[in-house]
Design a protein with these regions (language model features):
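A general structural motif
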Residues: 3-4, 26-30, 65-67, 131, ...
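Active-site-proximal segments of metal-dependent phosphoesterases and phosphodiesterases across multiple
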Residues: 140-170
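Active-site neighborhood of divalent metal-dependent phosphoester bond hydrolases
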Residues: 40-126, 130-131, 158
Length: 215
């Protein structure tokens, strides 16, 4: 039985101050970032907007140390999707800001970030304390194709759909974890650990099967 401890971290949306709190209290864990680590929400009042590269750099360092895995979310994918577009054609303000920050880097550093993001997984499965965990940002499909990739990143019926529809697409064995949907939701073997609409960051610890919201 694998007794490695995992800390599943829901959508951060640029709140590096909250991430620092989580890391300080979870030092002995391996981290699974559930996507949407960047792009500050306009309704956030508890935290200030910070450079997306500060967030990505911190997570990238943990990944290179084999202490973390980043699951690609729709907000990380926005970087790849809009990379070659003229600035005036990019609708999301935060995406324009992120791409502007990337363009200020040296070519080698920029390519290093892009290679890391393009090779980050869309789904991640692991075993901890006798349980199988299957993680994705919005929809679990380990056999995704270019045609179904968008569902994995944004869910079925983007941006919102009834949770019971999501339950129809998971198997009875294993524990399924998602971010993306704004509110925490726990039922049977389906768990959504996103707390964005509470201005918090949802975190789940596999060793003690505990869900917490950090602010």
């Amino acid at each position: 039985m694998n007794t490695e401890k995992y800390c599943l971290i829901g959508d951060l949306h640029g709140r590096i101050d909250t991430l620092d709190k989580i890391l300080d209290k979870s030092e002995r864990y391996k981290y699974i970032f559930m996507g949407d680590t960047i792009h500050h929400k306009p309704f956030f009042k508890r935290s200030k907007r910070t450079s997306p590269l500060r967030m990505l750099s911190k997570i990238k360092k943990l990944v290179k140390q084999n202490r973390a895995t980043l699951i690609l979310g729709n907000n990380e994918n926005y970087i790849l999707k809009n990379l070659l577009l003229p600035e005036e054609d990019i609708l999301q303000k935060e995406v324009r800001y992120t791409l502007g920050c990337l363009r200020e880097l040296s070519l080698d550093d920029r390519l290093d970030y892009l290679h890391w993001l393009t090779t980050s997984p869309l789904t991640y499965e692991f075993e901890s304390y006798g349980r199988i965990y299957r993680c994705a940002h919005a929809y679990y499909n380990p056999n995704y194709t270019p045609e179904t990739r968008n569902n994995v990143l944004t869910g079925i019926g983007y941006p919102w759909f009834k949770v019971d529809k999501l339950e129809d697409h998971i198997k009875p064995e294993g524990e399924y974890f998602f971010g993306h949907y704004g509110y925490p939701y726990f039922r049977k073997n389906l768990k959504i650990i996103d707390a964005t609409n509470f201005e918090g960051v949802g975190v789940y610890y596999t060793d003690r099967e505990e869900f917490l919201i950090y602010y």
